[in-house]
């Protein structure tokens, strides 16, 4: 699978998405939006926890914490556990990397194929089947916490976890939006292209064009219910929509 192949985030990347034109001239929707307010970094988890517990649902709340590796969405999700539990909620985390496909499938076109990384590393069907559908309306409220150890590529053979209807389950990872997954609420950690380049570990720099394309075509900062501008985690800013009951199926679709 060649990185020069054209497709958009519905299945075709543009040629320039992986080349110098986009890297040098990407339009960063995450830094030009309006309605952002500074938030004390020490209070960010409390602000988000208050928001989540205000949402009314008759099943466990399925919250996506989406962001590039540079923003460490899994770290923010872990920081949310204590404040959510202090507010009387059962809270659990799923690291989206534990729902990656087997390495033989991820690396079928090479270890650094951008199209594969963007579309085929995450087993979205398994995430839907084992987590999101069971936690949704009419589901069993039992979910699989992990499918595979991403470091060893071995199945973790985890047992399903039962949770009460008022539980909050956080699914944290990269490139989660725009897949039609039935999240009830979504948070996007927005990091612009320059900051991503500075903050992404060297071994993951090859993935940066996929995030540039994600910003440009999926526009996660427009899809998410909450956007946290996270170029500097010490000085975040937040844009939040109005508190409301969740929609019957708050899905974002690839366009």
PLM regions and their residue ranges:
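Post-Walker A helix-loop "phosphate-sensing" segment adjacent to the P-loop in P-loop NTPases
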Residues: 82-92
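Loop/turn-to-beta-strand initiation segments
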Residues: 165-169
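Pre-Walker A adenine-sensing motif
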Residues: 45-56
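Conserved nucleotide-sensing/catalytic segment adjacent to the nucleotide-binding pocket
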Residues: 92-95, 100-152
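Low-acidity, Ser/Thr- and Arg-rich intrinsically disordered low-complexity segments
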Residues: 1-5, 12
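Glycine-rich phosphate-binding P-loop
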Residues: 64-82
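Conserved NTP phosphate-binding and transfer environment spanning the P-loop NTPase/kinase superfamily
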Residues: 19-42, 176-255
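Hydrophobic beta-strand scaffold positions of dinucleotide-using enzymes
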Residues: 170-171, 187
């Amino acid at each position: 699978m060649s990185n020069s192949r054209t497709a958009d985030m519905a299945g075709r990347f543009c040629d320039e998405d992986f080349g110098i034109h986009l890297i040098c001239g990407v339009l960063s929707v995450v830094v030009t939006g309006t309605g952002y307010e500074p938030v004390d970094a020490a209070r960010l988890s409390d602000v988000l926890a208050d928001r989540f517990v205000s949402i009314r649902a008759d099943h466990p709340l399925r919250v996506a914490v989406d962001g590039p590796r540079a923003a460490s969405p899994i770290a923010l999700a872990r920081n949310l556990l204590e404040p959510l539990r202090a507010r009387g909620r059962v809270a659990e985390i799923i690291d989206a990397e534990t729902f990656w496909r087997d390495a033989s499938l991820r690396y079928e076109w090479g270890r650094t194929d951008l199209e594969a990384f963007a579309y085929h590393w995450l087993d979205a069907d398994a995430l839907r089947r084992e987590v999101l559908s069971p936690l949704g309306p009419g589901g069993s409220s039992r979910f699989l916490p992990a499918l595979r150890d991403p470091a060893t590529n071995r199945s973790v053979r985890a047992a399903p976890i039962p949770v009460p209807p008022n539980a909050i389950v956080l699914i944290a990872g990269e490139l989660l939006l725009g897949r039609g997954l039935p999240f009830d609420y979504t948070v996007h950690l927005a990091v612009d292209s320059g900051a991503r380049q500075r903050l992404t570990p060297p071994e993951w720099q090859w993935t940066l064009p996929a995030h540039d394309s994600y910003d440009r075509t999926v526009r996660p900062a427009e899809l998410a219910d909450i956007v946290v501008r996270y170029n500097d985690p010490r000085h975040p800013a937040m844009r939040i929509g109005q508190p409301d009951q969740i929609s019957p199926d708050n899905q974002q679709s690839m366009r």
